[in-house]
Amino acid sequence: MIEISDSKYSRFELINWWKQEILSDAHILVVGGGALGNEIVKNLAMTGAGHIYVTDMDNVELSNLTRSVLFRKSDLGEPKAKTICRRAKEINEDISVKYFDQPVQRLGLGV
């Protein structure tokens, strides 16, 4: 029988190649805060990705609510990237999230 720890990420220990410390130390840039960006950030937060950066220049619109899991009606008019980061932190307070509301080309290599 396999022993599983009490860690938040204990179920991942069942995957023999999984290395939580690598994901926890990772710096990941998500370009775009639409439906796909929402899902990616949600999953990264839930799995404990250490440092998530999100860039998007748009604001949350009504049409986003039916396809973007991290947006709520109360977020209408707010920057998508900022809202996504706030929700990711609600999902997992142990991660670091930072947003940019500018084109990815302007971020440079020092993100």
Language-model features, listed with the residues they occupy:
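Adenine nucleotide-associated cytosolic modules
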Residues: 1-111
